[in-house]
Amino acid sequence: MLTSISADIMEKLKILSDAAKFDVACTSSGASRSGNGNDMGSAFASGICHSFTADGRCISLLKILFTNECIYDCKYCINRCTNDVERVSFTPEEVCKLTVEFYRRNYIEGLFLSSGIIESPEHTMQLLYTTLFVLRNKYHFNGYIHIKGIPGASSEVLEMIGYLCDRMSVNLELPTAEGLRAVAPNKARKNILTPMRFIQNGIKDSRMYHGNSSMKNRMYIDEQAYYEQMAEIKDSTARLSEYHRSLRVATDCGKADKLAEKSWGMGVQLDPGVVCETTDVSYGDGDYINNTGLSIKRPDRYYVPAGQSTQMIVGATGESDYQIISVAEAMYNRFDMKRVFYSAFVNVNMDESLPGIGQPPPLKREHRLYQADFLMRFYGFKAGELLSEDNQSFNDYIDPKCQWAVGHLECFPVEIMTADYYTLLRVPGIGTNSVRRIIKARKHAKLSFTDLKKMGVVLKRALYFITCDGRMMYNTKLDESYITRHLIYNERPDTMLLADNKSCTYEQMSIFDFISE
């Protein structure tokens, strides 16, 4: 029982956490930041959702809206201005108290904060900035924060808030501009892409300013590139910690102004005790101000260190899977997105102009899009390889990697002992970890199918596409329909031999399929 939280705040929490449930937040923190002895929380290490750190740990986030008031009338949103729902808003202080109280009780390890639009995008983002500023500087919360960027807000407030959060996301909402106009008449594609570009450039400039490369090379399909990037991150973290220590020493000696001017060349450093005009919080120790008196950045912070992400709604409009993954690919390549999320459409407003009334959300389709997304991010696939203008939808019965493989049987079977890293990555049932184990082990001995299974290879999918020392696991026919049927039913080929002249389809198997001639 949170006895220090008032009943009014708890009622707001109940409403605004429920209103936030359709915003996707299942993302890794992407930032490693341990406790420093002075602040509370660490980014590495009723609205609670789960996320995953860079090392695979599951953490909990307090997932809430700042307000469910909104001036927009998006057809897919429960908080649209024409809906008759109870409207409530937090204050910055209330959000901070909730976050701190939940953290102290070990309920959460971070905050996911989104919001409806109050008065204007600029006014709303200023409220979110004030919230994060108070949380970081008054309550010294050092944990993970994911903030939603609002299209239409100024670049100044986006810059200020980017140095307080770990991740910022601007929702693309729909894959196409036509779809956006149809269901969100108050939003424009250009207004969404503009802050995305600003955040991208801010991240790039910040990383280069700290001596790192930009975040463009993030597809770890090459193990050497992967380990080089990990070493770079470790090195940059060490240098950042060293600078932070030197800054504190200089501050203690009364030389902070000189050090900041020499090292960063960024404006005038505030003396401790300067009060932010928009809050009652004192700040200093490396914060900088613009002409409004608001704190912009600290030199020891990265700008949006965990990168930016976006979200697309799946099934609200008529876009195909091919269009969706093509847009996702463009987001990764042109905007350096850390993640693109997909949200199966739920017709919460029972709007007759939208699909889904009386139907379950397209969760299987959402799942296939996530699988394809991983193939593009970590396996080197392109959107045009997975789908095409002639085939614009993923198979409901087999995953995208299997679908690609059975459509490109000219590339198979692959010899385990000689195939290169990239070729092995394209084999169904073989992941990045298994590929590295295979390449390492085959230098010392010939590998068998039993060895592959111990290395994590999923043989029930891989056996149709590989050979070990020139031999397949079973006498398998390289036929698209034949292999597809076996992948669907997960049966062993030696128990399901078909006649050579038999026509294979994706229908339910008959008793005659089990009879060998």
Placement of each model-derived feature along the sequence:
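A glycine-rich phosphate-binding loop feature that marks nucleotide/adenosyl-phosphate handling sites
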Residues: 32-34, 214-221, 345-350, 385-401
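Flexible, acidic/Gly-rich N-terminal and inter-domain linker regions that tether
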Residues: 1-69, 458, 466, 474-504, ...
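Short Fe-S-cluster ligation motifs
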Residues: 100-114, 372
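Canonical Radical SAM [4Fe-4S] cluster-binding loop centered on the CxxxCxxC motif
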Residues: 64-93
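Conserved AdoMet/S-adenosylmethionine-binding subsite of the radical SAM
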Residues: 96, 119-381
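Conserved, mostly hydrophobic/aromatic
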Residues: 61, 74, 113, 170, ...
